[in-house]
Amino acid sequence: MGKERKKASVSLSPQTVFAVKTCVYLALACFSGLSLWSFQHNQPYTQNWIGLLGWSLSSFLLYNFGVAAFLIPLNFGWLSFLNMKRTPAPLAFRKAAAFGAIPVCCAVLLSMISPAQNLPQFLATRVPMVVMDLQPPKAYLGGIPFYLLYDGNSFSLKLLIGAVGTGLIFLAILLCAIFYLIPKSFVLKKKALLDDLLKFLKNKFYACWNACKKLLKNLVNNKSYVPKPSLRVPSSPSVAKKEMLKLPTPVISLPLENKDLHDDSSVNRTIFLTPPHPTKRTLSPQKRTDLPNLLPKDSALAPAQTSYKPLPTPSPFVLAGDAPDLPQYHLLSKRNVHRPESLLEELKKKAAILQQTLASFGIEAAIGNICSGPTLAAFEVLPNTGVKVQKIKALENDIALNLQASSIRIIAPIPGKAAVGIEIPNPDPQPVNFRDLLEDYQKGTQRLQVPLLLGKKANGDNFWTDLATMPHLIIAGTTGSGKSVCINTIVMSLIMTSPPTDIKLVIVDPKKVELTGYSQLPHMLTPVITESKEAHSALIWLVREMELRYEILRFLGLRNIQSFNSRTRNVDIEASYDKEISEKMPFIVGIIDELSDLLLSSSHDIETPIVRLAQMARAVGIHLILATQRPSRDVITGLIKANFPSRIAFKVANKVNSQIIIDEPGAENLMGNGDMLVVSPGSFAPVRVQGAYICDDDINKVIKDLCSRFPCKYVIPSFNTYDDPGSMDPEDLDPLFNQAKTLVLQTGNASTTFLQRKLKIGYARAASIIDQLEEARIVGPSEGAKPRQILVQLSNQDD
């Protein structure tokens, strides 16, 4: 045949090449190590474990390198280890060169020692014994060539730079080679430990110095040094001694005979005390109330019956998390989480692949800390000097391909660290149980005013935040991303950490099935709202409650709800106010699910009070949580977005939605099932959190337990007739009201001068009719020079 057959080219895969190199280097390490260990001058080559070849190799290495020859097998072993980690060839060559410089430097430094005699048996039978200058045979620890290099007759380092210079130069080269081989992550860990130790010693030194200085000052002034009593009583004498060294300056000095000071539970929970009245006054269960009566008695918004009476002295302000009547975490079901032992080894393999991938693209970097969370694993990449961070960011898809990950997230750089964070899905994901978060919170010492126990971060740490500092929150995510579970977690966080006297809830659920089970909670101001008309009435009520609270704060000269709840009550001043002032203002949290459905039905009615509450309600303890599965620009408008700095993004459909909710892409790559990005005020980057999960059975058990502990008393039983135009008294309406309403709806013009001209009435009467139309929610509020907005259509109104 005229055609020649082409020879099939055989190409080896990179894995095979690395495996072959590893075996070769490991064999050389064993070969040289065994031959050196079994070598002796006075024995025949047959006694060497490697035979004649091993005896000859050992004789050559020991003659030229001396004792430093034993480092050569370690060099081959290090090369085998680098190939096992799949270190790229250029980086492996540089590390091997650094390791090869170590025996050379050691040989020169050993040659600086005078030729030794009377060596141990192990060295005497292995290092070269040479007769020089008709002297008795001596052992040269660094080998003959390096000794001649250091102290030869014609040319020597000792003659050129001296013994001190030679030692400094080769010692510096040796240290540089060692430091180059030490991993950067190991150095950073030791540096962090050293910094913490120095900081601890510094604080202790200054504490002792200040104590001694104050003691010496009192001794010089001939005064006995007696520390002032503190508000907190130590639990043991050893703790008392430590507290005396800290020299606290108490704000309030209490008599030592006060029996309340010996009650640890009351001391730990009390953060406000009144010196003239050390005893504590509490309300009986029959007098327990759900919401302070901040409204006038004749108002339609006030509850029918109230049991609040002004007290001569305020009760101590008890933190919400320590209330003894709240259900504990034991009520929830416990789930055992098992982590396989092979997880750490698998993550180390992923880290090696990550380092190899970066090196293949010319990025020299080390792998720092490896954190394993419930569903995510995070790697800290420590790039070398000169590496652009954006270059790592551009390799997101390539890194995901090599790590075989469904999606990854790159944080470039990590705020506050000289590192780049790479988050990948955990090979063994585990759900986050809400019971674990609640248990850690109830057992811990940190207490928040409006706690939200959301989940765990990528490194496994608990993540909870205070809604009082956020102060409003938007939650967005597609169906099945975990948005509804997050809302249930938020509600459970509030009701299991705060009594009904501290936090009240207003919940809007247009779906009518997700949150209606919370209607019987004692924390509820009103049953769960399911109609958009009732939602608007509830928002209007919250606006008026906000205005009333601001009036009370202005009258008392206070700035916020915290100062109101911790004030010292003056009965005479509060009695002069025209409305009854309660002892305490509870926080009010409004939760609105499916905001997009409400905005579709009545956009202006819903958006206007939401924006006003978001702008002003923080100081008086009213906070909003909005949730939507469609984070588009017509739902999360510019006004809403500007007044809601805190946002939670679950998995969204595309990059545009992620840009709307958290101002940057990334939410479209989340894994779903509770995987979220949390943006807080003042944060440099979104925090990735795995949301906690709580089952329906646990929710029902908690609701049943709370209903048995606290009575359910609604402040407003229903918003069906609240602020409803149809419920207005016809006698209060102007006789021309219906005619003016029809005229406004037909023409679309709602101005006082227009009605004055068309109806031929005076200005005062026309202005009164406009006010009645606004109260009936037919026209919007005045917007200055702009015309009033028409809120309803003519077909929707009945004559």
Swiss-Prot record:
Database matches in PROSITE patterns: FTSK (PS50901)
Induction: In infected human monocytes transcripts are present only on day 1 post-infection. In patients with confirmed synovial Chlamydia infections, 0/8 had visible transcripts. In infected human Hep-2 cells, transcripts are visible from 11-48 hours post-infection.
Top-level taxonomic group: Bacteria
Gene3D superfamilies: 3.30.980.40, P-loop containing nucleotide triphosphate hydrolases (3.40.50.300), Winged helix-like DNA-binding domain superfamily/Winged helix DNA-binding domain (1.10.10.10)
Record-level GO BP terms: cell division; chromosome segregation
GO CC annotation: plasma membrane
GO molecular function: ATP binding; ATP hydrolysis activity; DNA binding; DNA translocase activity
Keywords: ATP-binding, Cell cycle, Cell division, Cell inner membrane, Cell membrane, Chromosome partition, DNA-binding, Membrane, Nucleotide-binding, Transmembrane, Transmembrane helix
Membership in a protein family: Belongs to the FtsK/SpoIIIE/SftA family.
The protein's role, per its UniProt record: Essential cell division protein that coordinates cell division and chromosome segregation. The N-terminus is involved in assembly of the cell-division machinery. The C-terminus functions as a DNA motor that moves dsDNA in an ATP-dependent manner towards the dif recombination site, which is located within the replication terminus region. Required for activation of the Xer recombinase, allowing activation of chromosome unlinking by recombination.
Complex formation: Homohexamer. Forms a ring that surrounds DNA.
Protein name: DNA translocase FtsK
Taxonomic source organism: Chlamydia trachomatis serovar D (strain ATCC VR-885 / DSM 19411 / UW-3/Cx)
